[in-house]
A protein has these predicted regions:
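Beta-strand-rich interaction surfaces with strong enrichment in secreted/lumenal proteins
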Residues: 45-46, 206-208
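Internal alpha-helical scaffold/solenoid segments in large eukaryotic proteins
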Residues: 51-54
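Flexible beta-edge/linker motif
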Residues: 62, 67-84, 229-231
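Terminal amphipathic helices with adjacent charged low-complexity linkers/tails
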Residues: 88-94
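A structural feature that tracks compact, well-ordered secondary-structure segments
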Residues: 47, 59-61
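Solvent-exposed beta-strand/coil patches in large extracellular/periplasmic or lumenal scaffold regions
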Residues: 2-4, 11-49, 96-192, 214-289
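Outer-membrane beta-barrel proteins
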Residues: 10-11, 81-85, 198-202, 248-252
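Conserved catalytic/acceptor-binding region of the Class I
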Residues: 211
């Protein structure tokens, strides 16, 4: 049996590739690594990594048995995914942009002769857990703070015990599970949203609706694929929704009603200086997807 340790005090790197941002990824880092031959265990500790505008600290351990078992623990003061990941455009409801979105995803290396492995195959091929804490996280233009996540995978069943963070004056929690032990994959999430500005969410996912206001929501949704297109087309679920101080641009319902009344009654005078928007102090509804 042989054990060895390595202390890497400085590592400079630069990455370029089809699946990376145009400017690439560059940075520096340091870490300690240890291999225990008897236990087939590789551990990385004191990880300190910088990448573009982001930084990561923490460690990783993996036991390389027939079915690897891993443990990941990462923290960050600032993680900007918008400078680390390629953002593909979202297709519209009619699928007119689907070919454009597909073309934006450049080809990846082929894995064996059967093509690329299924997206969730890693959940069946290994077990593990991950704890993530990010003071500042930027994704699709959304600036999250105090992000805290805890995930555990066992035999193809991923439990998202915690996935929460602050966004502006509000808070989002997204616990759930992904069962990849069978076919098709089945995912269930129970979002809890409190006092989130809806305009920023709509903008992040390229929705053209001109709506603003404070959104709160509790619900449960399920589907067989985790992406924006699948959520629009095939996910199902229910939620209770509340909005405060909401504003819908381009349509004034009160003005529409008054115009309808004045057309049928010449004695009624409609106000002419309405803003071209509908404003509601409070709105609540039950929604089904």
């Amino acid at each position: 049996c042989e054990n060895f340790s390595a202390d890497i005090t400085r590592l400079d790197y630069q990455l370029q590739g089809a699946d990376l941002p145009k400017q690439g990824i560059r940075g520096e880092g340091s870490l300690k690594a240890r291999w225990e031959d008897l236990n087939k265990r590789l551990s990385i500790s004191n990880l300190n990594l910088k990448a573009n505008e982001s930084s990561l600290r923490g460690g990783l351990a993996v036991v390389l048995n027939d079915k690897p078992t891993w443990q990941l623990d990462l923290t960050s003061d600032n993680l900007n995914l918008d400078t680390l990941l390629v953002r593909a455009p979202l297709a519209d409801e009619n699928g007119e942009d689907a070919q454009t979105a597909q073309a934006a995803v450049l080809p990846r290396p082929v894995i064996s002769g059967s093509g690329e492995l299924p997206a969730w195959s890693v959940l069946n091929s290994s077990d593990g857990s991950a704890t993530l804490q990010f003071a500042n996280l930027r994704w699709r233009g959304l600036a999250f703070t105090n992000v805290d996540a805890r995930m555990v995978n066992k035999n193809g069943q991923l439990s998202v015990e915690r996935l929460r963070g602050d966004l502006g004056a509000g808070r989002i929690s997204l616990p759930g599970s992904v069962d990849a032990s069978g076919t098709p994959v089945h995912a269930v999430f129970k979002p809890e949203v409190s006092n989130i500005e809806i305009a920023s969410i709509l903008k992040a996912f390229d929705y053209p609706l001109a709506v603003s206001g404070s959104l709160s929501m509790n619900g449960e949704f399920s589907g067989d694929s985790i992406d924006a297109q699948a959520f629009r087309r095939s996910w199902q679920g229910k939620a209770s929704v509340e909005m405060a101080n909401s504003r819908l641009e381009g349509m004034n319902f009160q003005q529409l009603v008054q115009r309808a009344v004045t057309r049928n009654n010449n004695d009624v005078q409609a106000q002419q200086d309405y803003d071209d928007a509908t404003v509601m102090a409070h709105f609540s509804a039950s929604a089904t997807l």
